[in-house]
Amino acid sequence: MLEQMGIAAKQASYKLAQLSSREKNRVLEKIADELEAQSEIILNANAQDVADARANGLSEAMLDRLALTPARLKGIADDVRQVCNLADPVGQVIDGGVLDSGLRLERRRVPLGVIGVIYEARPNVTVDVASLCLKTGNAVILRGGKETCRTNAATVAVIQDALKSCDLPAGAVQAIDNPDRALVSEMLRMDKYIDMLIPRGGAGLHKLCREQSTIPVITGGIGVCHIYVDESAEIAEALKVIVNAKTQRPSTCNTVETLLVNKNIADSFLPALSKQMAESGVTLHADAAALAQLQAGPAKVVAVKAEEYDDEFLSLDLNVKIVSDLDDAIAHIREHGTQHSDAILTRDMRNAQRFVNEVDSSAVYVNASTRFTDGGQFGLGAEVAVSTQKLHARGPMGLEALTTYKWIGIGDYTIRA
């Protein structure tokens, strides 16, 4: 089965690479329109997936990731339209010039070819990834989690119908609908057809891909994100940022999981934090230095376990640790962070600059929420993933991250001397 999908995707990629921006936007507009026109079919399929997942004991955080609503589906369609409005990087001349030999040389952006994406209970990923791949002239093979099987099948059927209505091959966007985990291992060895692989899931999936894949892998998306509250932070303003970073949508990878509090501000900050977290329904996992003071407040508090500093809660849970100073905070982030998104709240711009320079994450913020790490927020459109590695792409992966380049030399029967 996968062999045939690979052949179809590779053939489709040749066709997609030749499309103009106008032609690619036409199919994207058609996909957006059809997602809305066929919304009832997609939502019914999703309702069945959610019901099955709930019956199987899926966590509330994962159920939130899985669930579609009419508003969320409309937002997904609108994201596709936003991709239409983005500049097409394909064909862009990055640099170039004329050599002494007279050869005119340029470096031009081109599609990667075929992208493989493995992800879990996130039905929006299906459309986000497909739209970005199509905009950049890439074919894509999707392998979603078993929890989204019906939703993905319905969504991909809509996308393929839109492709065919625009005289493009359905093989441009395909999904593996068999939940057999053995197919993941098989997919990881499809280097004959797939040019880049992007896993979007837990640490286990990333480890499997790094160890078994014969395809170049872009890893990321695991977000053990931190906020450091410096001693000069404005408490009321800091709390607004923390509430946003923790509660706006707890199941996302850019949600803060650990709060590091400078010891010199702890006595005034912790009572205010407890009050705010109680109102927000957040459970605090406190270290020994913060535990007694937080237990005196209204928030629900438990003693933090050492391993929780490495956990991506994806829920209304927040670690709280007292640190001696900025150096202590940076050391903690280096040990427990995932190089995703980390922030400092401070009025001391020297400390802010040190934090920016010394915290080696794909996105670092000063006096802002970690929730901004998102393709849409960065003006990149829907993202294919958030890369936490350093080669090829880093941070939210928009259109340019789905391209490579080729060198093109144009001469007049020019020969090398």
From Swiss-Prot:
EC number of the protein: 1.2.1.41
UniProt cross-references to Gene3D superfamilies, sorted A to Z: Aldehyde Dehydrogenase, Chain A, domain 1, Aldehyde Dehydrogenase, Chain A, domain 2
Top-rank taxon: Bacteria
Pathway named in the protein's UniProt entry: Amino-acid biosynthesis; L-proline biosynthesis; L-glutamate 5-semialdehyde from L-glutamate: step 2/2
Entry GO CC: cytoplasm
GO BP, sorted A to Z: L-proline biosynthetic process
Signal sequence annotation: none
Catalytic activity: L-glutamate 5-semialdehyde + phosphate + NADP(+) = L-glutamyl 5-phosphate + NADPH + H(+)
CDD domains per UniProt: ALDH_F18-19_ProA-GPR
Chief place of localization: cytoplasm
Record-linked PROSITE patterns: PROA (PS01223)
UniProt-listed InterPro entries: Ald_DH/histidinol_DH, Ald_DH_C, Ald_DH_N, Aldehyde_DH_dom, G-glutamylP_reductase_CS, Glu-5-SA_DH, GPR_dom
GO MF annotation: an example: NADP binding
Keywords: Amino-acid biosynthesis, Cytoplasm, NADP, Oxidoreductase, Proline biosynthesis
HAMAP family given in the database record: ProA
PANTHER family found in the cross-reference section: DELTA-1-PYRROLINE-5-CARBOXYLATE SYNTHASE, GLUTAMATE SEMIALDEHYDE DEHYDROGENASE
UniProt protein name: Gamma-glutamyl phosphate reductase
Taxonomic source organism: Escherichia coli (strain SMS-3-5 / SECEC)
